[in-house]
Amino acid sequence: MEQTIVRQGMALDEYIRRMDDDHEPPFEIIDGEVVPMSPTVSGSGYRAWWLAKLMNRVIDGNELGYLFSEITFVLPSPDNNWVTGSRTPDLMFISVVRFDTYRNANPGWEERPLALVPDLVIEVVSPTDRLSTVLKKVALYLEDGVQMVWVVNRMHQSITIYTLTDDPVTLSGELILTGGELIPGFSTPVRVLFED
């Protein structure tokens, strides 16, 4: 009996067609399955914008890299014609060296999904988000090769930092959030992120 192998994900051309279709709701590919994305609520979008504004002062001022808002990155197969996964974080940072290398190696990159795993991902938790779903996304990001994930919790006014090598660390109030080696020079008391 011949065994059928089912390839998870979708062809790159199909992925691009669906992403460009105005009638297709936004989606991610998680574990090979198409998962519809929930719309961003205003408070989460505002917190992401505020954090991006603070971070970009250091990122742009020191030419450290690029901070993207709600841009999808894909996990391509080795032949780049198949998408095995896609993620759309609230914010993501890619170092200038990695991004410039990617752009130079990929002519026409602007017309294709971003096939580059970010260095840092930031997710802003909405009141409707389930903790188990957020933690699953964190695990997927780290498995994808993201070096660090920040989870911003508006309800608790805290940020939890996840890496592959260290236990999660939660910061709040006067504790200082830093960009570490990824974004040297960035530091702010966590409370500043939640000021109106």
Q: What annotation goes with each model-predicted range?
A:
Residues 1-196:
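Gly/Pro/Ser/Thr-rich low-complexity, intrinsically disordered segments predominantly at protein N-termini
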